[in-house]
Structure formats: structure tokens, C-alpha cells
Amino acid sequence: MFSNHADMMLTQIAIGLCFTLLYFVVFRTLILQFNMCTPGREDAEVKLYSKAEYKASRGQTTAAEPKKELDQAAGILQALGGVGNISSINNCATRLRIALHDMSQTLDDEVFKKLGAHGVFRSGDAIQVIIGLHVSQLREQLDSLINSHQSAENVAITEAV
């Protein structure tokens, strides 16, 4: 059977190599000409950690982790424009999906990255903050912060009446 289709197989290999070369040249030219951001070509600098910094970050006790998550949740809540700007919060395996009342109240993407987010996507009045696999714990902390803020508002309203 090989003898019957050898020419066809060689032709397909040649076509595949030609298209590989064509794709490489076209996409490399487009990426370099228009300075398209691809993974690894962001404007922000990547911070490299030393071995001592890595070991210090892994040496934390488990009691410090909830405090760290609470601080991260509070920072993200402030970066989103506060409790009053949030319409709804949802999450998937790695992302926080948040519907906002006013997108202009949110802070820059770099603020989210400094708070531990891997990236941010904005679309209309919705924002997706890429957190990672610990997004469910962060969501619980956000929910508790929002609930405590709302209960504090309710107490203030009842005291005013």
C-alpha cells in the first residue's frame, strides 16, 4: 500500500513544511510589526525570586495563611471600587467573575497583579480576575467581607432610626 501512496505522502509532508514556514513568517512578522502582546511579552517586568526568598515564602505557618487571604480579599475588594460597586460575584475553577455597577471605579490591572492576581479581563461592566486554584477560599473571604460590611450598614441604619 505504501508503494501506491508514496508520492501522496511525500507531497503532504512537503505541503506541511511549506505551511509551517509560511505560518512562522507571517505570525512572526505580525507580532513584531504590531508589537502584539503574547504570553511572555507583557510590558510589566517579571520579578525573579532568590532561593532564600522562595524558602522564606514556603516557611509560613498555616495560621498566617487566612490572614494573608483576608488581606488579599480586602485589597481586591478595594481595587474593585468597594462593596457598593459590586453587583454580583461568581467564580469558576481559577477566576473571580464580578459584575460591577461602574467599571470606572476599578483600579489599574497592575494593582490586581500586585495583590496576587495572574491577570484581569474586562468586558462591559464585568471583570474577571484570574486568581488560580485557591479562588474558592478567596471568594469565601470576599463574601464574608461583603456580608460584614452589609451587616454593619444595617446596624447603622437601625441605630439611626
From Swiss-Prot:
Q: Known EC number(s)?
A: 2.7.1.-
Pfam families (alphabetical): PTS_EIIB
Q: Which PANTHER family match?
A: CYTOCHROME C-TYPE SYNTHESIS PROTEIN AND PTS TRANSMEMBRANE COMPONENT, PHOSPHOTRANSFERASE IIC COMPONENT GLVC
Protein name as catalogued:
Phosphotransferase enzyme IIB component GlvB
UniProt remark on domains? The EIIB domain is phosphorylated by phospho-EIIA on a cysteinyl or histidyl residue, depending on the transported sugar. Then, it transfers the phosphoryl group to the sugar substrate concomitantly with the sugar uptake processed by the EIIC domain.
Q: What's a Gene Ontology MF term here? A: protein-N(PI)-phosphohistidine-sugar phosphotransferase activity
SS bonds (residue pairs): none
List UniProt keywords, sorted A-Z: Cell membrane, Kinase, Membrane, Phosphotransferase system, Sugar transport, Transferase, Transmembrane, Transmembrane helix, Transport
Mostly located where?
A: membrane
What kind of membrane protein is this, topologically? Answer: Single-pass membrane protein
- Asked whether the keyword Transmembrane helix is assigned, the reply is yes
Q: Which residues form the active site?
A: C92 (phosphocysteine intermediate)
Can you give the residue ranges of the PTS EIIB type-1 domain?
Answer: 70-152
Q: Which organism is it from?
A: Shigella flexneri
GO cellular component labels: plasma membrane
- Which InterPro entries does its entry note? Glu_permease_IIB, PTrfase_EIIB_Cys, PTS_Glucose_EIICBA, PTS_IIB_1
The organism's place on the tree of life at top rank? Bacteria
Q: What does this protein do?
A: The phosphoenolpyruvate-dependent sugar phosphotransferase system (sugar PTS), a major carbohydrate active -transport system, catalyzes the phosphorylation of incoming sugar substrates concomitantly with their translocation across the cell membrane.
Q: Give TM segment ranges.
A: 10-32
- Cite a single GO BP annotation: phosphoenolpyruvate-dependent sugar phosphotransferase system
The keyword Aminoacyl-tRNA synthetase is assigned to this record: no
Can you say where in the cell this protein is located?
Cell membrane
